[in-house]
Structure formats: C-alpha cells, structure tokens
C-alpha cells in the first residue's frame, strides 16, 4: 500500500483506495501528482498532507475566495503548491517552516508550476513569525485562510495568533487532529512516542470545541483535520 494511502483513518484500506482513485487522483493537477510522487521517497513521507485532505483544502480556498493565506509547516510543499495553484495570480501565501531543506525538495516543481511568485517563504519558528505579522496592525484580520501542519504541542498557541490574523468569515484548518486515531484509544493501546502529542491533541480538540469565536467541523480525512471558521 502506498504511503499516502496509509494516512487514511478508514478501517478499510480498499475503501480509502477507492476514494483516492475515484474522486481524488483524477482531479489532482499533474504538478501536485509529481510532487506527491517525489515526496513518497522521502524517509518522512508520512508528514505530507494527504491528497484527500488537500482536495478539501482546495475547495475551501475557493469558497472563501482566498487571496492572502498563511501556511504553518511546509515540509516538501504539497499543500503549499496546492494553495498557490488555487490562489489568483496576485494572491500571496506566507509559508513558515524551520526547515528550508525540505521546502527545497519541492521547489523545482513549484517553479515548474509557475507559482513561486505567490509564495513568501519564511525560514523561522512559527511563533516568532506569527508575532512579527501581528506587530503590523494592517495584518490583523488581513488573511483569508490558514493551514497548520506543524509542531502539534503549539497548535493552541498558533490558534490564538491566527484567530487575530484571519478575517471574520475566514478559515483556519488544523491537520493531524485525530493523531492516527489514537485520540479514541486508551493510553495502554497507544505507542509511547505518540502519547505526548496525543494528550496535546485531546486538549486542543477540547479547546476548539469550546471556542465560541469559531464554527468548527472535524473530519476523518488524512490524519484528521479540523476546520475553523472565524465568527467574530
């Protein structure tokens, strides 16, 4: 089974494969397919955004008519490329990641797609980069969409900053909010290396559910995504 197929939370691998082959892959742009295949050979390929989750992201970007977006956590750039392809010609995505080396893997495909000019890559930890954006009052409520796939222990810290950067009616999407399904398992069934992030994810999910500033929807796509729409 392909690595991206392994990201699904559905109990039936055949059903997930059916979804990918019937509804996702036929609509996937060739440059995204190329980057997905390149990433497949990376030792940490499981970090990449699942293509079915990416497909939903593309629809959300279109629904909010996104022009200015933020991406926290880039890896090789599958979701970043998807965003850049979806944005209008004068759109802009601020992409934040500590590891430029992984971004460089996908950069040739991004250039080939002709969308590099839409990307402002910041090699930085996310919190100081977000704080820097907030230092400019013009940025408050100035973004349409954000996607977060980074340090899970800091998701809530990211949320408190992004809620100020995203406009009312804008969207924030968090990846990995079901953490391999472990959020519904007893700790005794969870591998030790998953425990710390599992606890942080459980706390995040509880806080997002209680956050009246956003409308939320949690979906079992990829490794679980939570969609937040800012209400005020």
Curated annotation (Swiss-Prot):
Alphabetical list of CDD domains matching this protein: AdoMet_MTases
Enzyme Commission numbers on file: 2.1.1.104
Cofactor details (free text): Binds 1 divalent metal cation per subunit.
Binding residue positions for a divalent metal cation: 149, 175-176
Organismal lineage: Eukaryota, Viridiplantae, Streptophyta, Embryophyta, Tracheophyta
Main function: Methylates caffeoyl-CoA to feruloyl-CoA and 5-hydroxyferuloyl-CoA to sinapoyl-CoA. Plays a role in the synthesis of feruloylated polysaccharides. Involved in the reinforcement of the plant cell wall. Also involved in the responding to wounding or pathogen challenge by the increased formation of cell wall-bound ferulic acid polymers.
Cofactors required: a divalent metal cation
Residue positions binding substrate: 7, 149
Protein species of origin: Arabidopsis thaliana
Claim: Transferase is one of the keywords in the record: yes
Superkingdom of this protein's organism: Eukaryota
Keywords: Lignin biosynthesis, Metal-binding, Methyltransferase, S-adenosyl-L-methionine, Transferase
Identification of the protein by name: Probable caffeoyl-CoA O-methyltransferase At4g26220
GO molecular-function terms, A-Z: caffeoyl-CoA O-methyltransferase activity; metal ion binding
Pfam annotation, one family: Methyltransf_3
Top EC group: transferase
Listed PANTHER family: CAFFEOYL-COA O-METHYLTRANSFERASE-LIKE, O-METHYLTRANSFERASE-RELATED
PROSITE patterns per the UniProt record, alphabetical: SAM_OMT_I
Residues engaged in binding S-adenosyl-L-methionine: 49, 71, 73-74, 79, 97, 126, 151
One Gene Ontology biological process: methylation
Family, similarity comment: Belongs to the class I-like SAM-binding methyltransferase superfamily. Cation-dependent O-methyltransferase family. CCoAMT subfamily.
Catalysed reaction, written as an equation: (E)-caffeoyl-CoA + S-adenosyl-L-methionine = (E)-feruloyl-CoA + S-adenosyl-L-homocysteine + H(+)
Pathway entry: Aromatic compound metabolism; phenylpropanoid biosynthesis
């Amino acid at each position: 089974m392909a690595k991206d197929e392994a990201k699904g939370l559905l109990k039936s691998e055949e059903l997930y494969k059916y979804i990918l082959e019937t509804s996702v892959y036929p609509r996937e742009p060739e440059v995204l397919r190329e980057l997905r295949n390149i990433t497949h050979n990376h030792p940490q390929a499981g970090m990449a955004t699942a293509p079915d989750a990416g497909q939903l992201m593309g629809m959300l970007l279109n629904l909010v008519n996104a022009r200015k977006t933020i991406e926290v956590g880039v890896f090789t750039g599958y979701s970043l490329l998807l965003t850049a392809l979806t944005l209008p010609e004068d759109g802009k995505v601020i992409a934040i990641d500590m590891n430029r080396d992984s971004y460089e893997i996908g950069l040739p495909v991004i250039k080939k797609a002709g969308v590099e000019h839409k990307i402002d890559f910041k090699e930085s930890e996310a919190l100081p980069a977000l704080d820097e954006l907030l230092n400019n009052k013009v940025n408050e409520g100035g973004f349409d969409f954000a996607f977060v796939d980074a340090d899970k222990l800091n998701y809530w810290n990211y949320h408190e900053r992004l809620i100020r950067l995203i406009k009312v009616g804008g969207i924030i999407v968090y990846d990995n909010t079901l953490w391999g399904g472990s959020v519904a398992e007893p700790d005794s069934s969870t591998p030790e290396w998953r425990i710390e992030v599992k606890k942080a994810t459980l706390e995040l999910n509880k806080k997002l559910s209680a956050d009246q500033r956003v409308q939320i929807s949690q979906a079992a796509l990829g490794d679980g995504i939570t969609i937040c729409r800012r209400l005020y």
